[in-house]
Amino acid sequence: VHWSAEEKQLITGLWGKVNVAQCGGEALARLLIVYPWTQRFFSSFGNLSSPSAILGNPMVRAHGKKVLTSFGDAVKNMDNIKNTFAQLSELHCDKLHVDPENFRLLGDILIIVLAAHFAKDFTPECQAAWEKLVRVVAHALARKYH
């Protein structure tokens, strides 16, 4: 994947403003609410019975932070995303059996969360760069499935 200097700047510039705990928790909660079938991967998280239960669930927030922290590794290693996510791809494929389509859905949700938090900075050019990044990350996570 080739990244232009402008794409890298748009991604790293916005990433520097992201509150990983807040945006990560919100992104995972949105995923579980908007796409309820994804909840089956999180049965150990306790109460996921309603949107308010999901939004208030500390395990959802903690795992969302973990997910977005790991996404930060993509931002730091934009020229080597495939290798950066090799182990996570293996885990999600072989052990957790996550449908790789869910990675794309989470990427879409992350775009919405970033746009909501950074409306002024989230220009069409910025969105295009982030859309490319979430596609590349989703593809890297799905790599073990191919």
Swiss-Prot record:
Reported tissue expression: Red blood cells.
InterPro entries: Globin, Globin-like_sf, Globin/Proto, Hemoglobin_b, Hemoglobin_oxygen_transport
Keywords of this entry: Heme, Iron, Metal-binding, Oxygen transport, Transport
One protein family per Pfam: Globin
The Globin domain, residue ranges: 2-146
GO molecular function: haptoglobin binding; heme binding; metal ion binding; organic acid binding; oxygen binding; oxygen carrier activity; peroxidase activity
Annotated Gene Ontology cellular component terms: blood microparticle; haptoglobin-hemoglobin complex; hemoglobin complex
One BP term from GO: hydrogen peroxide catabolic process
Record-listed heme b binding positions: 63, 92
Disulfide-bond pairs as recorded: none
SUPFAM superfamilies: Globin-like
Record's subunit section: Heterotetramer of two alpha chains and two beta chains.
Similarity comment text for this entry: Belongs to the globin family.
Function: Involved in oxygen transport from the lung to the various peripheral tissues.
Protein name as annotated: Hemoglobin subunit beta
Originating organism: Eudyptes chrysocome (Western rockhopper penguin)
Classification lineage: Eukaryota, Metazoa, Chordata, Craniata, Vertebrata
